[in-house]
Amino acid sequence: MGRYDFRPLRVRQTAKALFDSKRNPNLPQWYEVVGNIPPGETLARPILRAPKVRHARKASKLFKPLPITYAEDKLRSDFFGDHPWELARPRLIVEDSGNDAKKYDWSKIVQPGKQLDGESVVQRQMWLMKHRNLSKASAYDAARQEFYAHRHRNEIRARIAKEEAQYVGAYFGKGPLEIGMELEDKSWEAWKRWANVQIEDEQAMRAQMFSGQSDEAPEGEGSDMSAGEYDMAVEELAGQGSIPNTPQSTVVPEGTSAPAHA
């Protein structure tokens, strides 16, 4: 058969040969159709090569879609840039139509059925800029101060409610800050143990690499003698006729006892 398989192109010829040799009593129903509309003769689709245009200009951005921006985008960037920890608070991001903020009355920052968050500050700022004709900075300060006041009030309510519940016997587990501090303490203690091991290994390696005489005497060597040992040394030297640590290296005659150590 070689490199190419031509049997699909010869299906009609094969069917006619089988009919002529009377191996098939009838021609297939598609025989006339394939004869009127024969299959393509090319085995591979040719590669479409576009001519290379020299000195072509840069493609125009006329048909490039413009970025979709909203007026609230810059306000959100300013608020969450100043309050990055607000992004760590859990919040509901599911919306029905994308215009849920338009269903609230933003003449006040607190809305029934909506959690007080950064989006409340953004929408309140937009309302002040539109209806009170305030500047961007003034509206931002006003909305931010209202947000701080209500957030502080909510935290006081939650703290008092917790204290009242604990007073009547309720028990609350550890908070996220306490759990985080415990994990940090464990990591710190593990790091200290690892650091001590590394320091000991480094000191041992340096001691092995040092080939000279160490200035520091080993423990127990070079320390002061006890009183008994000193007396024994004095008596031993007295027998030799000299006593150390005495003025003018006093020479003791034979038969004379050495002075006792004070």
Curated annotation (Swiss-Prot):
Compartments in which it is found: Mitochondrion
An annotated GO cellular component: mitochondrial small ribosomal subunit
Highest taxon of source: Eukaryota
Short name of any one Pfam family annotated for the protein: MRP-S25
UniProt KW keywords: Mitochondrion, Ribonucleoprotein, Ribosomal protein
Disulphides: none
Annotated region described as Disordered, given as residue ranges: 211-262
GO molecular function: structural constituent of ribosome
Segments traversing the membrane: none
CDD domains per UniProt: At1g26750
Biased composition range(s): Polar residues: 242-251
Known partners and oligomeric status: Component of the mitochondrial small ribosomal subunit.
Recorded family membership: Belongs to the mitochondrion-specific ribosomal protein mS23 family.
PANTHER family: 37S RIBOSOMAL PROTEIN S25, MITOCHONDRIAL, SMALL RIBOSOMAL SUBUNIT PROTEIN MS23
Name of the molecule in the record: Small ribosomal subunit protein mS23
Lineage per the UniProt record: Eukaryota, Fungi, Dikarya, Ascomycota, Pezizomycotina
